[in-house]
Each structure stands twice: as C-alpha cells, then as structure tokens.
A protein has these predicted regions:
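Short, surface-exposed connector motifs at secondary-structure boundaries
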Residues: 19, 45-50, 265-268
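His/Asp/Glu-rich metal-coordinating catalytic cores
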Residues: 15, 24-199, 204-207, 212
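Short loop/turn segments immediately following beta-strands, especially the blade-tip
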Residues: 214-216
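N-terminal active-site segment of His-dependent metallophosphoesterases
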Residues: 1-35, 349-353, 361-373
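A generic secondary-structure signal
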Residues: 3-11, 39, 120-123, 253-260
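Conserved residues at the C-terminal ends of beta-strands
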Residues: 19, 172, 274
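Accessory, non-catalytic peripheral segments of nucleic-acid enzymes
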Residues: 10-11, 218-373
Length: 373
C-alpha cells in the first residue's frame, strides 16, 4: 500500500480499481483499515473505486460504511474513495472522468452466490462511453477453479465476459494472475492476483495491473504487470533416491534445486522431499543457518519419503517367509492388490511401511497420506 502513490504517479494513473477482498471482515484490525484508507487518501485527486467482495463484505458495521467508519475513527472516508454499496449492479460516474461509466456491486454476506451476473448485464446507460465493470467472481474454467481452491461465486465463463458490453472487467476473487483477451489480443478482463503473497496457496504470479482502457479493451502493448511483492513464496519438490544417505547430501540437492528454479534470498520456501530412500535412513536434519545464504525462511517436509525396502527379496527368502516379517509383507501385498481404489492402496501402503519400520525396530515416522482420504 505504501508503494501505491509512487506507482500512481509514475504511470500517470487516472483511476484505481479494487474488485474486492482487501481484507477479511472477521479479523481485520482498525490499524490495517486506517492504513489502507490513508494510502488511498494520498492518491487524491485520483479516484479509488472499491467493490466489496465476499471476505470484506459490506454491512452496517463495515468499515466501508461511511457512518460506521467515522464513528470508529473520528474521521471520514477520503473524498476520492467511492464504494459500491448495493448487492445489485449499479453505475457510477466520476466528475474527473466524464467519458467513463463504472459498474459494480457489493457482497453483503460471506456466502457463495450462484447467479451468473455477467450474463445478465447486456444493457448500458451510455454505450458510446468507456464502460468498466468491477466484478468479484469466479471464472468457471475447470483449470482456474482447481488451481484457486475456492468456491464458485458470481460465476462466469470466458465466453460470457467476451460477449459482455463492457470494455474492461476488473476481476477479483482468485489470488493468481489470469487474463482474458479477445481475438484481437486486447485484454477484456483480468485478475491481478493478490498483491502480496501470504500462503502456500499463493505461489503463482500476482501483480498490480496497469493499463490504458480503450473501446474494446486494453491493447496488449498498454497492459503492464507490476510486481510490488519484494519476495516470493515457493513450494518446491526435491526428489531423493537410495544414494542420498546423509543430511549434507540432501541439503546440496535442495540448494541445486533452488538455483535451478531461481529462489531469491528474500523468498520463503516450503520444501517437499519425496522418493525412495535407503531403509536405514530415518530422517534428515537441517540447521536454519544452512538456509540463510539461500533464502529468508525454509520449511522441510519429509513425510513423502519412503524407505526402499526390498519386498521381493523378503518374499523370496524362505527363512523370512516363516517369520512374522515375511508373513506380514505377503498379507499386506495381497491386501494392496485387492484394494478397491487408489486411495485405499495408498492407505495400505502406508500401513505396510509403518509395520516394517516397527518390525525392524525403527522409529515410527508419519507417512504421507492424502488428507482427503
């Protein structure tokens, strides 16, 4: 937020659009909200238009409500801030931009809305003007939905957006960067993503978007993705094998993967180790100082590592077949082969590894099993 005034000046921005979820209504602090509105005030006379989303929904005791904000803070909303306060799409005109009509609405509750708002918006007050919509909703493209991990709300399709009468749609809800362009290459709608990544579900690209809206969209040459996040959150998988038997060798493989992917010194990284390792390898240990030259913070998850037990040799060994370990492996192999689905196989394989660890006198270590199962 503190970098916003400089960005506005540098790019000669005429209006700032915020399509929702600036905060989480259930936990937002007075400090956060006032910092936000103070930053918007510094942009004056450039107008800022806000369309409250499902997380920062509008209600009588919302900081978006002018009277409540004044009672809580002792001051008014900045004069350059405009908030859509109706759950029904309405138009907004700003004296500074008389040739532009802005449209938008607000959420009043944090609940999914199934109405396809965009498909029903076909009539404009002044079609000859530039017409811009702020929409907090879900692109219902299958891949976009899967990667977002979010419930569908105010769903729309690419086809519905491209067929709409709006020259540009500022999109909010998904925390990753997505653009929707017409056949001429002009951008008709875009999610900037969350400006500052905060979790493992926000490892994708995310920007503040700047562009010149014209009739028919934003030309690709006038569309800029600007990163204001000084660091990135990574989720990196590092494959190990039986040859890696000590923590130093494991760290060197992690460091090589960091270099390959371009992890920076200010970044935070969640590292998932996976693969079949020597059965006598119980766990790898790392000192936080090991990572200081590579990144700001790192967490290592070893739950996907599996001991590379030679099950075929155990089953072929006549002596083992008469012992508990051989009988256990044979029984578990039969259970796995007759499992009804992959989820059941995964659980049974974890049970096999737990059992072999116990029979070999090794510590029982948590094995990865998909949380859905």
């Amino acid at each position: 937020m503190d970098s916003l005034p400089e960005l506005v000046r540098e790019h000669r921005v005429q209006v700032v659009l915020c399509p929702g979820d600036l905060w989480d209504e259930e936990s937002v602090s007075l400090e956060t909200v006032t910092h936000l509105f103070d930053a918007f005030e510094k942009l004056a006379p450039v107008p800022v238009i806000l369309a409250p989303g499902n997380h920062d929904f509008y209600h009588d005791c919302s900081y978006y409500e002018p009277g409540y904000y004044e009672r809580k803070t002792g001051r008014r909303h900045p004069s350059n801030v405009r908030v859509f306060t109706s759950p029904v799409v309405e138009s907004l005109r700003i004296p500074e931009l008389p040739h532009v009509d802005f449209y938008g609405c607000c959420f009043e509750h944090n609940v999914p809305q199934t109405e396809r708002i965009l498909a029903g918006l076909q009539r404009l007050n002044r079609p000859e003007n530039l017409n811009v919509l702020l929409l907090h909703g879900s692109l219902d493209d299958r891949l976009a939905v899967q990667r977002s991990g979010k419930d569908l709300t105010n769903p729309f399709s690419r086809e519905e957006l491209l067929a709409s009468p709006f020259d540009y749609v500022a999109l909010g809800h998904y925390h990753r960067y997505i653009t929707i362009a017409g056949s001429d290459g002009c951008v008709r709608g875009a999610y900037g993503g969350i400006p500052l990544a905060r979790g493992l579900d926000e490892t994708d690209e995310h920007y503040v978007l700047v562009g010149e809206i014209r009739k028919g969209g934003v030309p690709s040459t006038e569309f800029k993705e600007i990163s204001v996040d000084p660091r990135r959150i990574w989720r990196i998988t590092v494959a190990l094998d039986r040859s890696i038997t000590n923590s130093r060798a494991t760290f060197e493989r992690i460091a090589a993967e960091f270099r390959r992917q371009g992890v920076g010194k200010d970044d935070m990284v969640f590292i998932e180790l996976e693969g079949l390792v020597h059965p006598d390898t119980e766990a790898f240990f790392f000192d936080s100082q090991d990572f200081e030259s590579l990144c700001f913070h790192a967490v290592v998850d070893q739950s996907k590592l599996e001991p590379d037990y030679d099950l075929a040799s155990i089953l072929a060994d006549e002596a083992s077949s008469k012992q508990v370990v051989g009988q256990f492996v044979r029984q578990m192999k039969e259970e796995i082969e007759s499992a009804k689905d992959d989820a059941q196989k995964q659980i049974l394989r974890a049970a096999l590894l737990y059992g072999l660890d116990a029979l070999n006198g090794k510590p029982i270590r948590r094995r990865y099993v998909d949380s859905k199962h």
